[in-house]
């Protein structure tokens, strides 16, 4: 390679190539990953070996980062280097990277059934422009960015459905060195979806619609709610109701968990959540307990018909 460049130089060219292709929020995420994790380690490198990447992975995992987070970082690293290799400015050979096994498989944080009932009773008794977003997340599994970006025009009262087609988030722009609010399409193509509205949620939405002057379902402003400030509101609400702390995304986990517990089929739950595939839903929410395993074995034994 006559025109060899450093990883830092290649990453800048790669970002420029990605700019017209990916969402602005995605590009900002790439740049933040590069700035925070990759450039400090590999910025000056003109060659990155499998051994280098393997040690990087071990260091990141042992520092406390989740294995999925480290995989995502390595995916950006690989994409930059492969781009450099394609254009003859950086050498690349395929890696076989091993990731340290996780010692425990943590279940997603959820509300207990009792705490969910307490919260839902409060939300249904007081359907306000502030409370409705929490109820939306509990009854549909929508992400906080989708909840805050939801407009009344996306709620079909006649068909009793919600169309999820936007999300809002405040992201860090590495070029501006400041945060900015970004509206965009949802996380993946599967995230653009239609969700049926339950009877309880429909009634609450109608009551909020009567008093709302905002184009957005959540809040009273002409602009959407900031996800960060809405998380703070949710935290205060839980404290007021004497419910243990839960991150807002735990409402999505709670919705999915209750769907699985009530024996909804996995494919339908996956589509409602906007997951890219059923495997994501299964890995996150389907964790059979011992009694369920015993019933499975008993059914199989009975099916054989051998006494």
Which residues make up each language-model segment?
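Proline-centered turn/helix-capping motifs that create local helix->coil transitions or kinks
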Residues: 84-94, 157, 166-174, 207-214, ...
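C-terminal secondary-structure termini that scaffold catalytic or DNA-interacting sites
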Residues: 159, 170-174, 178-192, 199-201, ...
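Basic, Lys/Arg- and aromatic-enriched nucleic-acid-binding interface segment
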Residues: 67, 71, 86, 90-91, ...
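Catalytic-site neighborhood detector that most strongly recognizes the C-terminal catalytic loop/helix
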Residues: 168, 273-299
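Active-site/catalytic core of tyrosine-dependent DNA strand-transfer enzymes
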Residues: 32, 196-244
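N-terminal core-binding DNA-recognition domain of tyrosine site-specific recombinases/integrases
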Residues: 3-8, 15-83, 87-89, 105, ...
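C-terminal catalytic core of tyrosine-transesterase DNA break-rejoin enzymes
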Residues: 68, 86, 135, 139-146, ...
């Amino acid at each position: 390679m006559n025109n060899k460049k450093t990883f830092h130089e290649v990453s800048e060219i790669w970002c420029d190539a990605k700019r017209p292709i990916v969402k602005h929020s995605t590009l900002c995420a790439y740049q933040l990953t590069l700035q925070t994790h990759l450039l400090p380690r590999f910025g000056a490198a003109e060659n990155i070996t499998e051994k280098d990447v393997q040690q990087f992975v071990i260091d990141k995992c042992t520092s406390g980062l989740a294995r999925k987070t480290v995989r995502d970082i390595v995916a950006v690293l690989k994409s930059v280097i492969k781009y450099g290799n394609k254009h003859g400015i950086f050498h690349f050979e395929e890696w076989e990277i091993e990731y340290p096994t996780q010692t425990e498989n943590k279940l997603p944080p959820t509300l207990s059934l009792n705490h969910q009932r307490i919260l839902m009773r409060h939300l249904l008794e007081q359907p306000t422009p502030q409370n409705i977003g929490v109820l939306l997340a509990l009854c549909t599994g929508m992400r906080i960015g989708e909840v805050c970006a939801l407009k009344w025009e996306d709620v079909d009262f006649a068909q009793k459905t919600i169309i999820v087609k936007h999300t809002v988030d405040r992201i860090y722009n590495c070029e501006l060195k400041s945060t900015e609010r970004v509206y965009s399409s949802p996380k993946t193509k599967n995230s653009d979806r239609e969700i049926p509205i339950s009877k309880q949620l429909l009634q609450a939405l109608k009551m909020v619609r009567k008093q709302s002057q905002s184009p957005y379902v959540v809040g009273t402003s002409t602009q959407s709610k900031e996800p960060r400030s809405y998380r703070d509101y949710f935290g205060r609400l839980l404290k007021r109701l004497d419910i243990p702390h839960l991150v807002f995304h735990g409402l999505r986990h709670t919705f999915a968990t209750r769907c699985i517990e009530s024996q909804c089929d996995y494919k339908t739950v996956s589509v409602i959540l906007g997951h890219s595939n059923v495997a994501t839903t299964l890995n996150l929410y389907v964790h059979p307990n011992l009694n369920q395993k015993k019933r499975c074995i008993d059914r199989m034994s009975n099916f054989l018909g051998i006494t």
